[in-house]
Amino acid sequence: MYKAETRGISVIVTPRFVEEESSPDESRYFFAYTVEITNNGRDRVQLRSRHWRIIDGRGALQEVRGAGVVGKQPVLGPGESFSYTSGCPLPTPNGTMEGTYTMATADGESFEAVIPAFSLDVPHMRRVMH
């Protein structure tokens, strides 16, 4: 679990390797991540957009930008949370993701809420000695 908080907006990310969606022989490793966004502040906010920085095990950077998350632009009142799960394929068995959500207050002010950097790693496979 990875956590960051910006201006009362808490972002918690829990990643996991999805073996059944992966094909190591084809250099395809699929990871899922669940994000929980909680408004610990006093103002109602709306998540407007996302910006991800995805870096694979070779150091190749991919940036992803878009409106909302999973097709939604949730509005969070004080004390409210929103969770979603999404996924990311990588050509390597490890990598990292990080980014920001653009949040807007009711009065139109925008700010960037930090998405903590988190690791994407295939769990170590047990080695069998013969």
Swiss-Prot record:
HAMAP family: ApaG. PANTHER family: F-BOX ONLY PROTEIN 3, POLYMERASE DELTA-INTERACTING PROTEIN 2. This is Protein ApaG. Pfam families: DUF525. GO terms for biological process: error-free translesion synthesis. Residues 3-127 form the ApaG domain. Signal peptide: none annotated.
